[in-house]
Design a protein with these regions (language model features):
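Catalytic nucleophile serine of serine hydrolases
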Residues: 354-355
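Glycine-rich SAM-binding Motif I of class I
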Residues: 358
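Immediate flanking context of iron-sulfur cluster ligation sites
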Residues: 345
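A conserved active-site-flanking secondary-structure segment within enzyme catalytic domains
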Residues: 361-416, 421-424
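Flexible phosphate-sensing "switch/lid" loops adjacent to ATP/NTP-binding sites
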Residues: 2-315, 319-341, 349, 388, ...
Length: 505
C-alpha cells in the first residue's frame, strides 16, 4: 500500500492549517479509507500522551478525526519552547537532550532520516496521509534547512493546498507572494488555494481569484466562511483571549455563542473560570470543553486588574507550564501572585494543574537545572523536586472525599495524562508542625488545603471527563466525534465540487 498524500500549507502561522488538516482526515475516513495525519515538526507546548511518548495535540486530534490510533510517527519531531531561545526537543515521542543542545541548523540534517522514515511507514500502511506544514513554505531564510514544508511535500509527492486567512487582509498578496518565492519545481506541487475566514458576499471577491489563477496557474478551490466556533482549540496560542474580566468571549464575537466541542451556550454566566495565561503556558487545549458549559465564562488573564471582579464562586486556575519557575517569576512581576493568594484568602476557589500544582506549594527545588529553584505561592504545604527523567503517561485515578467547593468531585474516577519532571510531597517541617495538605488522589496526584478551597492536580484533561462537567456544572458537551463530523460537513459544503476527490486520484 502506498498512500496518496494531501498536504496543507499556509501563507502564515494561524492561517487554518491544523483545523483544515483535521477536517480532511475525517472527510477521507468517512469515505472508508485508511487515513493518517502527519506533521514532520511541530513547535508547541500543547502535547498529548500516546504509546511511545508524546506528540503535538493537533496531531493527536487529527488522528482521532482519521479514526486512527495516535502514533509518535505522526509527529516525529516536537519542539517544546522553554525560553525564547531554547526548546526541549522530543524525537519520536522521547526527550532527546543532545538534540535539545544542538543549534537548529545542525539539528535538521540529523533528524531528516527519522522524519522521512516515519512518513514512509505511514504511507506504506495507509490509503491517504494528510500532511500539515508549518508556518509558511516561503521562509526563504530557512529553506536550506527545511524539514517540514516543501522537502516533505517533494518526498511524499504530495498534492498541496495553500490556505490563507483572508480576514487579516492581504490574502491575495500572501498567496501570490508565497507562490512566487518558491522555486519553480516546488510551485507545481500547489494545486489549489483556500481562502479561510471569509466574511460577507463571496461574489465580491471577483475578479481576484481568476486574476490569481491567470498569474500562477493555480485555481482557488474553496472559500471558507468565518467560523469562530468550529470546536477545536487553537494550536499555538490562547483562544478567545479577553482583555478584561468584563469582556466576555461572546462579546468579542457578536452573534456567536460560546462553544466547547462545538455546541451552543447561553450568554449569561454564573461562574467565571479565570485561567492565568503565563508566557510558557502548556496544554491549554484541555480547557476547551469549558467554553461550552452553560453558566460558565472562560477567560484568560495576564494582569491583576482582570481578577478584580471575581466573586466567591469564581475560580482562578493556574494551568500547566513548560517553565514553571520562570512562569512563577513572571506571575510575581505582574503582581498576579498577590491576586491569587488574596482570592484564596477570601475563600475563593483556586485550581492548580501540573505546573500550577507545583506553583501552589512552598518551594520548587531543581537539582538538575531544569526549571530553576523558586519559592512557591505557599497555598499548599508541598515541596516539588524536579527530576531529570520526565513522567509521561496516561493515568486513571479516583478522587477521595473532598471538602467544598470541590466536594462534588468526591469519589469520582477520572482519566487524564501526566507530562512533568516534578515530584511533589508534603513539606516535612510544616507537616511536623501540623500543617498538612490532604492527599485526595493516590500517589500524590492531587492535594487539597485544610480550608478546602485550593485544589491541585497533576492530571491534565480533567475537564475532558464528562463526569467532571456533569458533577460540577450539571453539563453535558458535544462529543469529539460530532465535532470532527461537523468539520468534514463544513469543507464538503464549501469546497468546489469534485475537488476533495480529485486530490487523491
Amino acid at each position: 500500500m502506498t498512500a496518496k498524500c494531501v498536504m496543507v500549507l499556509g501563507t502564515t502561522s494561524g492561517a487554518g492549517k491544523s483545523w483544515l488538516t483535521t477536517a480532511l482526515c475525517r472527510h477521507y475516513a468517512r469515505q472508508g479509507l485508511k487515513v493518517a495525519p502527519f506533521k514532520a515538526q511541530n513547535m508547541s507546548n500543547n502535547a498529548r500522551v500516546v504509546a511511545g511518548g508524546e506528540i503535538g495535540s493537533a496531531q493527536y486530534f487529527q488522528a482521532l478525526a482519521a479514526r486512527a490510533v495516535p502514533d509518535v510517527r505522526m509527529n516525529p519531531l516536537l519542539l517544546k519552547p522553554e525560553r525564547d531561545t531554547h526548546s526541549q526537543v522530543v524525537l519520536m515521542g522521547q526527550v532527546d537532550e543532545a538534540l535539545s543542545r544542538m543549534p537548529w541548523r545542525g539539528r535538521s540534517a540529523s533528524v531528516w532520516p527519522v522524519i522521512h522514515g516515519a512518513l514512509d511507514q505511514l504511507m506504506a500502511e495507509n490509503d491517504v496521509v494528510v500532511i500539515e506544514g508549518a508556518g509558511s513554505p516561503a521562509e526563504i531564510n530557512l529553506a536550506s534547512s527545511d524539514i517540514v514544508n516543501m522537502r516533505v511535500a517533494q518526498h511524499a509527492h504530495a498534492v498541496c493546498l495553500l490556505v490563507t486567512d483572508i480576514d487579516r487582509g492581504g490574502a491575495f498578496a500572501h498567496l501570490y507572494g508565497t507562490w512566487a518565492l518558491l522555486p519553480e519545481h516546488e510551485r507545481g506541487l500547489i494545486k489549489g488555494y483556500v481562502l479561510n475566514k471569509f466574511r460577507g458576499d463571496a461574489s465580491l471577491l471577483a475578479p481576484a481569484p481568476q486574476m490569481l489563477q491567470d498569474l500562477t496557474g493555480v485555481p482557488t478551490v474553496a472559500t471558507l466562511p468565518m467560523w469562530w466556533q468550529h470546536g477545536l482549540p487553537e494550536e499555538d496560542g490562547v483562544f478567545d483571549m479577553t482583555p478584561t474580566l468584563a469582556t466576555s468571549c461572546a462579546a468579542l464575537h457578536p452573534g456567536e455563542a460560546l462553544a466547547a466541542w462545538g455546541g451552543p451556550a447561553p450568554l449569561t454566566h454564573l461562574r467565571t473560570v479565570a485561567v492565568v495565561a503565563y508566557p510558557r503556558i502548556s496544554n491549554l487545549d484541555e480547557f476547551q470543553p469549558l467554553k461550552n458549559v452553560p453558566g460558565v465564562r472562560l477567560v484568560w488573564v495576564r494582569s491583576p486588574a482582570q481578577l478584580a471582579g471575581l466573586g466567591a464562586d469564581d475560580w482562578i486556575v493556574l494551568p500547566g507550564s513548560k517553565n514553571t519557575s520562570g512562569d512563577l517569576a513572571w506571575l510575581r512581576t505582574q503582581g498576579l501572585d498577590q491576586a491569587v493568594t488574596a482570592h484564596a484568602a477570601r475563600g475563593g476557589a483556586v485550581l492548580g494543574i501540573c505546573g500550577g500544582l507545583q506553583m501552589l506549594g512552598e518551594a520548587l527545588i531543581d537539582p538538575h537545572d531544569i526549571d530553576g529553584n523558586a519559592p512557591g505561592l505557599g497555598l499548599l504545604p508541598l515541596v516539588t523536586v524536579f527530576a531529570r527523567d520526565k513522567t509521561v503517561r496516561h493515568t486513571s485515578a479516583g478522587f477521595a472525599a473532598l471538602a467544598a467547593p470541590w466536594n462534588k468531585l468526591s469519589g469520582l474516577s477520572v482519566q487524564g495524562y501526566e507530562i512533568h519532571h516534578g515530584q511533589t510531597q508534603q513539606h516535612a517541617a510544616m507537616a511536623a508542625a501540623g500543617d498538612v495538605a490532604r492527599a485526595v488522589m493516590p500517589d500524590g496526584l492531587a492535594w487539597q488545603n485544610a480550608a478546602g478551597n485550593v485544589l491541585a492536580v497533576y492530571l491534565h484533561g480533567l475537564f475532558e471527563n464528562p463526569g467532571v462537567l456533569q458533577a460540577i456544572f450539571g453539563a453535558t458537551t458535544p462529543t469529539l466525534d460530532s465535532v470532527f463530523d461537523g468539520l468534514a460537513n463544513f469543507i464538503e459544503q464549501h469546497f468546489e465540487a469534485g475537488v476533495l476527490a480529485s486530490l487523491i486520484v
